[in-house]
Amino acid sequence: MQILPIFFPLLITSLHAIPRGRRAVRNRNEGDINSLVGVGQYLYQGDIAVVKSRARRAVIRQKHKKWKLPMPYSFDRNFPSRSRQRVLEAMQFWSEKTCVTFHENRYVYPHVSIFEGNGCWSFVGKQPSLREQSLSLERSCTDHTFVVAHEIAHTLGFYHEHARGDRDQFISIDYSNVNPNLTFAFAKESEKQLDHQEAAYEYGSVMHYSVDQFAVNTNRPVIYARDQKFAQAMGNRMRATFQDVSRMNVLYNCHERCANTLNRCQQGGYPAPSDCSQCVCPDGFGGNFCETIEAHSVGQKDNSDCGGVLWASETSQTFYGAVRTRVHSNSVLPTPEHCFWHIRASQGKSIEIQIKNIISPCSMSCSFNALELKLSNFTMTGPRFCCDEHIYNRYSQPKVFQSEGPLAVIGAYARYDYLDFNIEYRAV
């Protein structure tokens, strides 16, 4: 298996020369894993392999760098069966939500060769000069289905969300807290090179790095959201978001498949390219036309505290919710358990919410569990929290959140142990 050299300023090396280093801490994202195994400094933006000639965009624009579908791929003969299952799960996610399909065939060229290399990395889009295009997934990478989905998205043509040329309107980078060997991982693309499909900035994108990515002092953020409500929404890989899916559908012209289908989908949803009779719905919505609540994950079927519809009145009410994993060891779930709630009020009203407490494994980036509030544009990721410090102001009072209309959506995700919370809400 050949792996071409990668080039960027002050660094010309070969991936063959990358030291294995110490094993990655489990259950982090691809950037952390690559940094810990010693390969991050050899990869553009921390997990991207590049050839000498490249064009950098949020998504690729050149037609010759998009894959003819189904995208052919092969597994290295020594690729672990457990890791293979994670790859197939990630591929299934993209196939169910888009028109992108995959076909295992090592005898077609070019194709993607998936192997257990050093770290988690991929090229961006099809590389016409390569017969076998490498996609490296060491075992730590496959602890999390959506770390794999992130790398597959690179292979299909996605760059990082935080590399957008307009990113300074939405985030700032504290370079004083970035590992000096990895400052280039936060390279920003120029507007002339950028193709972000005129999409809104998605803090929760599966292509966004986390708030503490490559930090020297892990008690301080590296990435600061201009809107601090979204500080913990960045990079926790709970799922590829509705916006990620929509951009993939635009990139591969998937909407053409349902061009003659009446769009009856609500809340910004649209006919699913894989089955035009179904809808691709924003996170938190389900049913035939996105008219109802998204179903809970299979593991929550016996959890009476998971999900439901609540009606707000002008009198404050409280409710308790929980999502549980039954995982209490050093391992975590590859895909989080999830529950959703809709809080509704009468027309002309909005909903005021205070989160009284959260009981959950706490981390700066909420990489294990998270509670999400969607208060306005339901097609975008909302603020996420996993610690009491995230929900209290400097006066030790619960922060007050208010929806823009008569609907608020609450999502709870857990990959480890459980997440319990108490909320007070009312119509205003």
From Swiss-Prot:
Domain of life, per lineage: Eukaryota
Q: By its UniProt entry, which InterPro entries does this protein fall under? A: Astacin-like_dom, CUB_dom, EGF-like_dom, MetalloPept_cat_dom_sf, Metallopeptidase_nem, Peptidase_M12A, Peptidase_Metallo, Sperma_CUB_dom_sf
Task: Name one molecular function that GO assigns to this entry.
Answer: zinc ion binding
As given in the record, the signal peptide range reads: 1-17
Q: What is its EC number?
A: 3.4.24.-
EGF-like domain ranges (all copies):
250-291
Question: Needs which cofactor?
Answer: Zn(2+)
Q: List the propeptide residues.
A: 18-57
**Where is it mainly found?**
secreted
Disulfide pairings: C99-C254, C120-C141, C258-C276, C281-C290, C306-C339, C366-C386
Subcellular localization, as worded in the UniProt entry: Secreted
Catalytic residues in the record: E151
| Database matches in Pfam families | Astacin (PF01400)
Q: What does this protein do?
A: Metalloprotease.
In Swiss-Prot or TrEMBL terms, this protein is called Zinc metalloproteinase nas-27
Q: Which organism is it from?
A: Caenorhabditis elegans
Organism taxonomic ancestry: Eukaryota, Metazoa, Ecdysozoa, Nematoda, Chromadorea
Q: Which gene is annotated as encoding this protein in its UniProt record?
A: nas-27
